[in-house]
From Swiss-Prot:
Changing R296H: De novo variant found in a patient with intellectual disability. Its main location: secreted. Transmembrane segments: none annotated. This is BPI fold-containing family B member 6. It comes from Homo sapiens. The gene is BPIFB6. The keyword Iron-sulfur does not apply. InterPro entries: Bactericidal_perm-incr_a/b_dom (IPR017943), BPI_fold-BPI/LBP (IPR051660), Lipid-bd_serum_glycop_C (IPR001124), Lipid-bd_serum_glycop_N (IPR017942). Residues 1-18 form the signal peptide.
């Protein structure tokens, strides 16, 4: 019984993927989006407008009536990472509090203050999305000026100001912090939505666990879900080595790391789109695609077809495409069959001449367009060529190496590049503009150095 339990446990462990399929590191450059969120939401001004309205259940402030808040200064936000927690936030701002004082005259208090809070970064259990939650909000008075008469007893003035401000400001400012975080959290909303890869399937960036915070950055580990249109999930291959960020990037900067295994899984969605049936006789710089041209490389073709016939070529990718990466260079490996047919008269089906198995590599260049990862390829080299069947007898397929190489370059690779124009989706978070990113091919991964512009 114990042995059965052990076997069951081992099978569960081996079936669980613990390694992330993509990594996102957010430095302070990106997290300063909190500043823009406060600017965009105009939350302080809105809170100030609400301050003068009677709120249900709120007791009037003793000694002041007709309370209003105006002249709210543009806030300056300072952020610091708190390891294991999230972000410590300090908002420096100023405003003017007006009203009727207990002495009967108009009162004006000019306040400079700091609002501090810890924004804990969590993973929402229901949505699986990152979420900021504020805690420990405090309002610290930096400077206070008032138009109250100078002949009043200082202790009385200070006591009144202290009582008034500590009643008004926390209720005004701390909800502003929460409201800004709600605004920021909305910018995570689309992160785990399925995004299309053409019409062949979708990619979804699923957060594996709560984001990890260090003294320099926040890291998010993703387990991307690559799913075919019919619902079948494509598993990421085992990378063999743990996915880690390379050294040498500026402190406080932000990067996205996409491993070659993940890109391979995405391209597997497009495998059938790489199948082609080419019937054109004239293609680019190639000689006419006829049996006469083919006979220059295989004399047996001239014997079987004394009169020249048009050729049709069918290429099918037999294994899922595989992306590999070494520093500075990325290759796309394609294992295919290439079958050539000769046309026949009277609407008869073309006759198969031969079937080859072809393994070749394409060099890959990466770019970003409209927030999609783009790939453009060119032939690296033809790796192997083997004959599987032939209707024209035995021949030395190596004699076709130059012919097939030119054919791939002129006829097939343009088809591959057309298919790749669908683009590969990138994580949708904080309204990130990937078009500004700098791309680097590192060991086993593609690095996007994110920029705000």
């Amino acid at each position: 019984m114990l042995r059965i339990l052990c076997l069951a446990l081992c099978s569960l462990l081996t079936g669980t993927r613990a390694d992330p399929g993509a990594l996102l590191r957010l430095g302070m450059d990106i997290m300063n989006q909190v500043q823009s969120a406060m600017d965009e939401s105009h939350i302080l001004e809105k809170m100030a407008a609400e301050a003068g309205k009677k709120q249900p259940g709120m007791k009037p402030i003793k000694g002041i009536t007709n309370l209003k808040v105006k002249d709210v200064q543009l806030p300056v936000i300072t952020l610091n990472f708190v390891p294991g927690v999230g972000i410590f936030q300090c908002v420096s701002t100023g405003m003017t509090v007006t009203g009727k004082s207990f002495m009967g005259g108009n009162m004006e208090i000019i306040v400079a203050l700091n609002i501090t809070a810890t924004n804990r970064l969590l993973r929402d259990e229901e949505t699986g999305l990152p979420v900021f939650k504020s805690e420990g909000c405090e309002v610290i008075l930096v400077n206070v000026k008032t138009n109250l008469p100078s002949n009043m007893l200082p202790k009385m003035v200070n006591k009144f100001l202290d009582s008034t401000l500590h009643k008004v400001l926390p209720g005004l400012m701390c909800p502003a912090i929460d409201a800004v975080l709600v605004y920021v959290n909305r910018k995570w909303t689309n992160l785990s939505d399925p995004m299309p890869v053409g019409q062949m399937g979708t990619v979804k960036y699923v957060l594996m666990s709560a984001p990890a915070t260090t003294a320099s950055y926040i890291q998010l580990d993703f387990s991307p879900v690559v799913q075919q249109q019919k619902g079948k999930t494509i598993k990421l291959a085992d990378a063999g080595e743990a996915l880690t960020f390379p050294e040498g990037y500026a402190k406080g900067s932000s990067q996205l790391l996409l491993p070659a295994t993940f890109l391979s899984a995405e391209l597997a969605l497009l495998q059938k789109s790489f199948h082609v049936n080419i019937q054109d006789t004239m293609i680019g710089e190639l000689p006419p695609q006829t049996t006469k041209t083919l006979a220059r490389f295989i004399p047996e073709v001239a014997v079987a077809y004394p009169k020249s016939k048009p050729l049709t070529t069918q290429i099918k990718i037999k294994k899922p495409p595989k992306v590999t990466m070494k520093t500075g260079k990325s290759l796309l490996h394609l294992h295919s069959t290439l079958e050539m047919f000769a046309a026949r008269w009277r609407s008869k089906a073309p006759m198969s001449l031969f079937l080859l198995e072809v393994h070749f590599n394409l060099k890959v260049q990466y770019s970003v367009h409209e927030n999609q990862l783009q790939m453009a390829t060119s032939l690296d080299r033809l790796l192997s060529l083997s004959r599987k069947s032939s209707s024209i007898g035995n021949f030395n397929e190596r004699e076709l190496t130059g012919f097939i190489t030119s054919y791939l370059e002129e006829a097939y690779i343009p088809v591959v590049n057309d298919v790749l124009q669908v683009g590969l989706p990138l994580p949708d978070f904080l309204a990130m503009n990937y078009n500004l990113a700098e791309l680097d091919i590192v060991e086993n991964a593609l690095m996007l150095d994110l920029k705000l512009g």
